[in-house]
Structure formats: structure tokens, C-alpha cells
Amino acid sequence: MIAVLKAGYLSLRPEHSVVAVGPIPVADFVGGEACVACHAAQTTAWQRSQHARAMQRASPQTVQGKFDDARFPYAGVQSTFSRRDERFVVRTDGPDGKLADFDVKYTFGVEPLQQYLVELPGGRLQALSIAWDTRPQAAGGERWFHLYPNDRIDHRDGLHWTGRQQNWNFMCADCHSVNVRKQYDATNGTYATTWSDLSVGCEGCHGPGSAHIAWAKDKPPSDARMGLTVALDQRHGAKWTIDPASGNAKRDPPRVGDRRSTCARNAMHGGRKSPKVTSPVDRSSITTFPRC
């Protein structure tokens, strides 16, 4: 009877099932460059992806906004975006509310908007609230806009670009970079944040790769995991549906163990947009997905 029930159960299992493949190996982060030799095609595809451009050092090749002495008024403050040789400079209200010049250190995202990170004392990277709409001009893009257009956010507000809620170390780093160590010093309120990959590299989804590299040298058949710390086979057969009660997306079936579906999208990071979207941050008409 047990054998019959087991056979019936197996026949009902989905085509892509979850199979136990052994214990999770202990591994260290090695950086995406270590993957290129064996995975050249995947690297080329990744270089064209938004993952590769989730965060980049500011340069003429990465900055999409027009830093041509463009001016943007908001809440009584006139901000100016300009170029000084290879530097991208924003003149805007600082932590004390006074106008000052700030160098853009990094770009943040590429579509449908690009934000810019400025470094403040104490190792803090802050995301400017004035961003560049990267959509085509015909779609209403190629312009500067404020993330809170209907408010009057000044330096005393927690949502001001110099505040905690716009702090990269605290709010953004874990998803936009790999192997982030925030290293916050509570005594003096400073950061000494480090990472192994600035953008979302291979190990951002696959986990630390040292054990996989060790496996690749000999490829022992006994290691069905191939030295990988994260399995990505649960993307097969999975569906995301909106819970009417919470408004959040729910995965069906739920994830099991250490396996991971592909990184899900959310409203601010490439979510599917309806034709009614009139702004790159129009939450009302963007299908949302949870973080992975």
C-alpha cells in the first residue's frame, strides 16, 4: 500500500522538482572576475544587464543625466547640475540647508530612472532626491525630476537626501552590491563600508564562489551541488500572485530550504509597467514584486 501511495505521489510531483543535493558548502566571496574564464558567454550577457549597472562609478560613460548647468527648482531651492572636467557636480542644499557643491561619486540604476550618490563625511553615501528620468523624451523622459514632487522636503526632514532614509549604507547597499560589510561605528556614527563587487555580480545571486571554483578544478561526481551555496532551480514552475488583503506578491509554491528563485522585481527596479505610467516612480500603475 505504501509503495502504491508513493508511486501516486511521485506521479503528481511537478516536472521540475526540488531534490536534496547535500549540505551547503562553506565558501568565501571571490569577486565576479574569478568567474569570467569559465563563464565568458554568461559574463557578456551580464555586462548588458541592469544588474551590471545597478551601481557604477560616475564617469562620462555611466552618467545619463544632463550635467550642462541644468537648473531644477524645488521647495525654494535652486539646484544646479554641472560638469567640471571629468567631475559631475551638484550644487544644492546640504545637511544645514545651505547651498554647497557636491561631487557625484556613483550612479544608481539605469532604467527608468538614474539616481546619483554623493559622499558625505563619515563614510556616508547619500542618494540625491533629484533624479534623471531615463525614458525617451516622447514618453515624458530625459528630464530632471524630484522623487517627492508633491511635498516640500527640506534639510530638517528625514526624507531629505542628506538624511538616514536616503543613506546608501543603511538602505540600499545590500541589494545593489555584493558581500557588503556596512561596518557602522555606533560610537562616532560613521561607516567604513566595503564590498567585493560594486554592482550585482555573479555572487549576488549564486552566493560566495570559492567552493565552486575548487569544485571546477576536479569536478568530483560526489558533489552534486558543484560547490554552489545557492541553488536556483526553483524558478521553474513558480508563480507570483497578488494577495488582495496585503497587496503584496506571494510565491506559489513557497521556496524550500536554501534554494532561490531568480531575483524578483519590484516597483522601483524594473517592474512591469502599464501603458498608463506617466512617471518613472508612478507606484499606482506598476506591478510590484517582492525582494528575493
Residue ranges of each PLM-predicted region?
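Post-cleavage N-terminal segment of exported redox proteins
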Residues: 1-21
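Primarily the internal scaffold of c-type cytochrome electron-transfer domains
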Residues: 16, 33, 41-109, 113-120, ...
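Extracellular/periplasmic ectodomains of large secreted or surface enzymes and adhesion receptors
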Residues: 22-23, 291
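Residue-level marker of regulatory loop/turn positions in helix-turn-helix DNA-binding domains and
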Residues: 23, 27, 164, 194, ...
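Local sequence-structure signature of Cys/Sec-based thiol-disulfide redox active-site neighborhoods
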Residues: 25-40
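Disulfide-stabilized extracellular ectodomain repeats and their linkers
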Residues: 32-35, 169-172, 202
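Extended acidic/polar, glycine-enriched regions
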Residues: 120-129, 134-170, 174, 178-182
